[in-house]
Regions:
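C-terminal, beta-rich DNA-binding module of retroviral/retroelements integrases
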Residues: 166-218
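Residue-level detection of beta-strand-connecting loop/turn positions
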Residues: 35-36, 87, 215
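Active-site beta-loop-alpha junctions of metal-dependent nucleic acid enzymes
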Residues: 55-82
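Short, charged, surface-exposed loops that flank catalytic or proteolytic processing sites
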Residues: 27, 146-162
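Basic, flexible linker segments flanking DNA-binding modules
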Residues: 1-26, 31-32, 95, 100, ...
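RNase H-like two-metal-ion nuclease catalytic core shared by retroviral integrases
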Residues: 85-87, 98-142, 155-158
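An active-site-proximal beta-strand-loop segment
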Residues: 22-53, 63
Length: 218
């Protein structure tokens, strides 16, 4: 006998996007990927092709982790149209009590995306970004063993390993990229990328035309 699913629990399968770069899904997964300490793997995957477009390890889920995978995307593919992610990540707006703009992570990332013309959508529902959820399931089955065989023990070693692992993963499991169906805009210059993927600090110019940062005047 077929079991009826309630409307609240029903999540119809989402069709793939038509174009490469039309929608990227981002998230981070804390797991025992290598060694004896859990780390956060930040990931971005293209919805249309299943191509992994960015991977980066950090000690925890951080703005730095998302900036690094965004840097990989911009330098290799260009500017995507839309990024989908979870509300529980640094993409969610949570104003810190200190009111310091540099600690307001959503402001930092959203401003960077606004400068590039990238749209952001967030949701707390896992089915909102099924592609990246399934990616982490696959990576949890495959990646720890490969890192162990490569004798990886540090984050730096793991990130270096990922630079070659992404291509092997995509060649085996993703659809081929059809450049005629790409909506990625042209790659910005390295100088522009470095200026945009930065952490902003609000400072006041004093009467001596100087600013103070980390106890130093400039």
């Amino acid at each position: 006998q077929a079991k009826m699913v309630t409307v609240e629990d029903a999540h119809p399968r989402q069709p793939r996007c038509q174009y490469f770069g039309e929608e990227l899904q981002m998230d981070a997964c804390i797991h025992l990927w290598f060694g004896k300490t859990k780390t956060a793997l930040h990931a971005a995957i293209d919805d249309a092709t299943g191509q992994v477009v960015g991977l980066y390890f950090d000690k925890e889920e951080t703005l730095n982790g998302y900036y690094n995978i965004t840097h990989q995307i911009l330098t290799k593919y260009g500017i995507p149209y839309l990024i989908k992610t979870d509300k529980r990540t640094v993409f969610e707006y949570k104003k810190k009590a200190s009111s310091k703009v540099e600690e307001d992570t959503f402001t930092q990332y959203a401003y960077a995306c606004k400068q590039l013309g990238i749209h952001i959508k967030t949701s707390s529902v896992p089915e909102f970004k099924p592609r990246v959820e399934r990616l982490f399931q696959t990576l949890q089955q495959r990646l720890p063993q490969e890192l162990r065989l490569a004798q990886i023990s540090t984050i730096d070693e793991a990130n270096k390993f990922l630079s070659t692992y992404i291509k092997r993963f995509n060649d085996k499991l993703a659809l081929c990229i059809n450049n005629n169906k790409s909506v990625f805009e042209n790659q910005p210059s390295n100088e522009k990328i470095n200026l945009i993927l930065a952490i902003l600090f609000k400072r006041v110019v004093d009467s001596g035309h100087s600013i103070k940062y980390n106890h130093h005047y400039y």
